[in-house]
């Protein structure tokens, strides 16, 4: 159903944007722990 894609696309874009912003911080935290 194309409506599922219409709903999922912005959700995936937002998730990808959030991951891209959070990832460097998360990596820094992990390196601090190790």
Curated annotation (Swiss-Prot):
Task: Write down the membrane topology.
Answer: Single-pass membrane protein
Do you know which Pfam families this protein is assigned to?
PsbY
From the record, give the transmembrane residue ranges. 6-22
Q: What does this protein do?
A: Loosely associated component of the core of photosystem II (PSII). PSII is a light-driven water plastoquinone oxidoreductase, using light energy to abstract electrons from H(2)O, generating a proton gradient subsequently used for ATP formation.
HAMAP family xrefs = PSII_PsbY (MF_00717)
The molecule here is called Photosystem II reaction center protein Y
Which BP terms in the Gene Ontology apply to this protein?
Answer: photosynthesis
Origin, by domain of life?
Bacteria
Species this chain originates from: Thermostichus vulcanus (Synechococcus vulcanus)
Q: Which GO terms describe its cellular component?
A: photosystem II; plasma membrane-derived thylakoid membrane
